[in-house]
Swiss-Prot record:
Source organism: Nitrosococcus oceani (strain ATCC 19707 / BCRC 17464 / JCM 30415 / NCIMB 11848 / C-107)
Superkingdom classification of source: Bacteria
Example GO molecular function: structural constituent of ribosome
Signal peptide segment: none
Family affiliation: Belongs to the universal ribosomal protein uS10 family.
UniProt keyword annotation of Ribonucleoprotein present: yes
Protein name per UniProt: Small ribosomal subunit protein uS10
Pfam families named in the record: Ribosomal_S10
GO biological process: translation
Length: 104
């Protein structure tokens, strides 16, 4: 039995609306070209919290807290055709989305 070829796509972004829109575009493009898509699977959101002192000298109680959330999605495209790969390469995604593509 031949092993299936899988394209694994990981998306990262700070804005969840942007990452969901990009995931929809990838899924629509892959389905239009006849590939089977698993996902998008939401992965755990990474939350980085920073606490900064407001006062330059005294008043240690005066602080601001900031948070950066990194949203992630995972998609598998099973048995992609040549047409699917070409369409995904030509796809223009939003600037705030980091895309990692892995062939297995």
């Amino acid at each position: 039995m031949a092993k299936q070829q899988i394209i694994r796509i990981r998306l990262k972004a700070f804005d969840h609306r942007l990452i969901d829109q990009s995931a929809r575009e990838i899924v629509d493009t892959a389905k239009r070209t006849g590939a089977h898509v698993r996902g998008p699977i939401p992965l755990p959101t990474r939350k980085e919290r920073f606490t900064i002192l407001i006062s330059p000298h005294v008043n240690k109680d005066a602080r601001d807290q900031y948070e950066i959330r990194t949203h992630k999605r995972l998609m598998d495209i099973v048995d992609p055709t040549e047409k699917t790969v070409d369409a995904l390469m030509k796809l223009d995604l939003a600037a705030g989305v980091d895309v990692q593509i892995k062939l297995t």
